[in-house]
Amino acid sequence: AGVVHVADDIDELTVAGAQLARGLLPAKPFLVMGQYSMVDPTRSPAGTETAWAYTHVPREVRGDAGDGDLTGAWTEREAQAFALRIEQRVEALAPGFRGLVRGRHILTPGRFAELDRNLDRGSMHGGTAQLHQQAIFRPTPGLGRPETPVERLYLASASAHPGGGVHGGPGANAARVALNAHRRRRVFGA
């Protein structure tokens, strides 16, 4: 598959979610993982594969539910230790995986925020993915749709419904609304 979600079962997902809600780095992080060259062979040299994975961490780390001493400072040591935890998750489900890894590139929440100021505290969701920021409440009550009070300005970022992680969803919503508005202007001249 091009993209897989990695967790043993719903109970493990529930535990990881509870750990995140308490501000703890999950002992067994839930992963979204993919292989670029499965859908685009030009993304990796012939005979090789490029894999990526991401997980969620608390916006404010209060502790580590794993057997480590991670604090959320995301020093090089902490980034490497958490990446190892992620690799161990994959290794448990795909024995031999770690022996195939030739290199890795780690983007911590702080690095994400440096690369894109829209990613508040490094969140790909443009903020939080908690319930109070979903559906009609995203990004704030009254702006839960792509339309804004500014004519021909539409919300299309991870901060808009349905949020980050629904890759392309906010942009598709905004494009649909913009195209419909354009058609109405052509037909009705308004």
Can you name each region flagged by the protein language model?
Residues 1, 16-17, 43-46, 62-67, ...:
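Short conserved micro-motifs at the rims of enzyme active sites and ligand-binding pockets
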Residues 26-32, 92-161:
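A glycine-rich dinucleotide-binding beta-alpha-beta segment and adjacent secondary-structure elements
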Residues 48, 74, 78-86, 124-190:
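C-terminal structured subdomain/cap of oxidoreductase catalytic cores
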Residues 9-12, 36-40, 58-60, 129-131, ...:
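Short, glycine-/Ser/Thr-/acidic-enriched flexible segments
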Residues 1-44:
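Mid-domain catalytic core of redox enzymes
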Residues 1-2, 96-102, 184-189:
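Acidic/polar loop patches that form or flank catalytic/metal-binding clefts of enzymes
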